[in-house]
Amino acid sequence: MTAKTFRIGGIHPEENKLTHEVATQTAPLPKQAIFPLSQHIGAPTKPVVQKGDKVKVGTLIAEAGGFVSAPIFSSVSGTVAKIDTAIDATGYRKPCIIINVEGDEWEESIDRSDKLELVKDHPELTPEEIVTRIKDAGVVGMGGACFPTFIKLTPPPTAKAECVIVNAVECEPYITADYRLMMEHADEILVGLELLMKGAKVTTGYIGIETNKPAAIALLTEKCAQVFGASTYHVEVVPLQQRYPQGGEKQLVDAVIRRQVPAPPAIPVNVGAIVQNVGTAYAVYQAVMKHKPLFERYTTVTGKRLAKPGNYLVRMGTPMQDLIALCGGMPEGDNKLLAGGPMMGKALTSTEVPICKGTNSVTILSGDDARRKEPQPCIRCAKCVGVCPMGLEPYLLAKLSEVKNWERAEHEDIVSCIECGSCQFTCPAHRPLLDNIRQGKQTVMGIIRNRNAK
């Protein structure tokens, strides 16, 4: 089968998949867990615990703060130390719940067995029941965007879902958490996909995987034939070319079903597709079949100078410094700590930042990789235009943001930028294109929100 890909732009950064074949280990419990109240797109959560309260693993500690929101559950047992502020993966101080860890006592409602539960054995699982369980468990997109999953499964009346696409691309350099998840929990992922299809009331599913993961392609192709071969569902594993940002939602839809998602506010379901990360499919299985809220995730801890980079199943709230210590500690010399990968990750100033729902990687860049080169004047080469997967003009958007020409920036479609970093990666003048565009995009989106609220 010929590998597919998206049609506009794209780059080929060095993979650096250092932990590709490193089996996942379970990270030890932290001494203290930190839970930011905003771990998703939408309204922050509201605490339902207070200082001195006892909690177990799986206890609700913060309820959804609005329709677009997702509850947060404790990943540890212990005592609530305080409700305070702490630096989260955005780099800013945000409200959080801090819990002192005592033992590892779980809520009795959680099924901790390894038995694989199948959808056909649970007739009570109507589409509505599936969506409710996903919502109540706080499941969000695990690829980094953290959009509440239940909302994607209930599109507006103006849009009709035709298929579910599982995003198993993992095109960001260094990160291998999704790959290890596929190799270690393929059966659960496919049950999760079936639940997503049933919840969305569709019978067609796709799993998009880049060709640099042949073992995962072979394994999931074989499993799909076994699971869905004689069922009413049609599920296909789609090999995709190695090309960044192949895992971008709109790029994935273009590659898999050959449909292009229009500019915002359009979303993939407007062209018939619901896109969910492979980690989300696994979390959906856990939530629906095991009554297990989202409180842990697969995370890669990596860097060229780390002594022992690895993949870990991590309880949310665990400080990054605990994981770095497991890998041999912070390397000597200049280092840059990222929540995420080198293309879209956020640079951090503290190792005390906790693992949250969207933290797919803790990446440490060292030496020259940790230092930015001095920006030079734009040489008008248009390389940034050629690689932009959204067909934008990054040099222009960056300049408009720099001079605060918000009206023109909106006209030039700055809100369509997916912040993939391809422009900045390819710029021979080392200009901070993404930095400027990201700031400008946030400003323009705020202007649009205020205008629509009037």
Where are these regions (language model features)?
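N-terminal, Lys/Arg-enriched amphipathic/low-complexity engagement segments
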Residues: 1-48
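Acidic low-complexity segments
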Residues: 87-147, 158, 214, 227
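Gly-rich Lys/Arg/Thr-decorated short loops/hinges at beta-loop-alpha junctions or inter-strand turns
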Residues: 164-178, 305
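Histidine-anchored nucleotide/phosphate-binding helix
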Residues: 183-198
